[in-house]
UniProtKB/Swiss-Prot annotation:
Residues at which Zn(2+) binds: 184, 247, 264
Protein name, UniProt field: 3-dehydroquinate synthase
Broadest EC class assigned to this enzyme: lyase
Function field: Catalyzes the conversion of 3-deoxy-D-arabino-heptulosonate 7-phosphate (DAHP) to dehydroquinate (DHQ).
GO biological process: amino acid biosynthetic process; aromatic amino acid family biosynthetic process; chorismate biosynthetic process
Organism listed in the record: Salmonella paratyphi B (strain ATCC BAA-1250 / SPB7)
Pathway membership: Metabolic intermediate biosynthesis; chorismate biosynthesis; chorismate from D-erythrose 4-phosphate and phosphoenolpyruvate: step 2/7
GO-annotated cellular components: cytoplasm
InterPro entries in alphabetical order: Dehydroquinate_synthase, DHQ_synth_AroB, DHQ_synth_fam, DHQS/DOIS_N, DHQS_C
Gene that encodes the chain: aroB
Binding site for NAD(+): 71-76, 105-109, 129-130, 142, 151, 169-172
Record-stated family: Belongs to the sugar phosphate cyclases superfamily. Dehydroquinate synthase family.
Subcellular location: Cytoplasm
Keywords attached to this entry: Amino-acid biosynthesis, Aromatic amino acid biosynthesis, Cobalt, Cytoplasm, Lyase, Metal-binding, NAD, Nucleotide-binding, Zinc
Length: 362
């Protein structure tokens, strides 16, 4: 069992990583006998894990209610959020309740925002079931729902009480979802850790076949990097923005194509290559390193070009609504070398459009 602490003073919390955690009531600390829980999951995961998690919590004396939501990025919305609020109010659940997010990034983000909002804030626990959510979205307290005009535009910074990463969940993960998560894994190597990127080049095949030790190390290293960044910059005033490599371009793809048509990691993968191309055009990133990135993404089964349905001009309206925009100026996360990156303002639209055009499908 691995345990990593996100250090935020009195709001610090553990990330527990191991196989078989759903069999151990102690995995779900700080829950205790007599606590009330609303377990939030989706229609795909409920048949797989709902009864198992409910059972382990009830054996610990926890009172468990549940709400099952539709599955998909398109349901990460205010309308579906209201379904959670209605379930909480009907029981009813008070300020001493705990929300448990059992699912991937959509469930985690939506449940976290529900916890931040319900009765001005209640406790919640992240139980991520996809690789993407285990290495990224469950850690750090970013919670949100989407708006038709932009991804994650309505939300809050709100930290969980704990994160429970059961590696066994990856056994039921579709191959496309596994690849989507690998985009975020590869991102960490590009922005923060050249040695980890090199490790990924040598161990990607092991990750694709869900090799236990390789996957445990991969998830642990990603969580360590994320925990360090969040501890240093919880509210994304500087360093934490680096975690958005590829996301400004990627969010534009998701919004323009319709949420769910491109998985988040797929859009981020294409966005990472666009960011690398932009950095190349600015003379601060080598084409050889871009090719290393492209090769690793392609081995993971990820796209390295944007959708053929989008022109370069289609990206800009979405990108200018990005949360990193200041005073109307586009700011991009750009790689400087494998393992090193920066947030750069003042990148011309010409450079951005050219970088996108470099990544257009033929």
């Amino acid at each position: 069992m691995e345990r990593i602490t996100v250090t935020l003073g009195e709001r610090s919390y553990p990330i527990t990583i191991a196989a078989g955690l759903f069999n151990e009531p102690a995995s779900f600390l700080p829950l205790k006998s007599g606590d009330q829980v609303m377990l939030v999951t989706n229609e795909t995961l409920a048949p797989l894990y709902l009864d198992k998690v409910r059972g382990v919590l009830e054996r610990a004396g926890v009172n468990v209610d549940s709400v099952i939501l539709p599955d998909g990025e398109q349901y990460k919305s205010l309308t579906v959020l209201d379904t959670v609020f209605t379930a909480l109010l009907k029981k009813p659940h008070g300020r001493d309740t705990t929300l448990v997010a059992l699912g991937g990034g959509v469930i985690g983000d939506l449940t976290g925002f529900a916890a931040a909002s319900y009765q001005r804030g209640v406790r919640f626990i992240q139980v991520p079931t996809t690789l993407l959510s285990q290495v990224d979205s469950s850690v750090g307290g970013k919670t949100a729902v989407n708006h038709p005009l932009g991804k994650n535009m309505i939300g809050a910074f709100y930290q969980p009480a704990s994160v429970v990463v059961d590696l066994d969940c990856l056994k039921t993960l579709p191959a496309r979802e596994l690849a989507s998560g690998l985009a975020e894994v590869i991102k960490y190597g590009i922005i923060l850790d050249a040695d980890f990127f090199t490790w990924l080049e040598g161990n990607l095949d092991a990750l694709l076949r869900l090799d236990g030790p390789a996957m445990a190390y991969c998830i642990r290293r990603c969580c360590e990097l994320k925990a360090e960044v969040v501890a240093a910059d919880e509210r994304e005033a500087g360093l934490r923005a680096l975690l958005n490599l590829g996301h400004t371009f990627g969010h534009a793809i998701e919004a323009e194509m319709g949420y769910g048509n491109w998985l988040h990691g797929e859009a981020v993968a294409a966005g990472i290559v666009m960011a690398a191309r932009a950095s190349e055009r600015l003379g601060q990133f080598s084409s050889a390193d871009t090719q290393r990135i492209i090769a690793l993404l392609e081995r993971a089964g990820l796209p390295v070009n944007g959708p053929c349905e989008m022109s370069a001009q289609d990206y800009l309206p979405h990108m200018l609504r990005d949360k990193k925009v200041l005073a109307g100026e586009l700011r991009l996360v750009l790689p400087l070398a494998i393992g090193k990156s920066e947030v750069r303002g003042g990148v011309s639209h010409e450079v951005v459009l050219s970088a996108i055009a470099d990544c257009q499908q033929a």
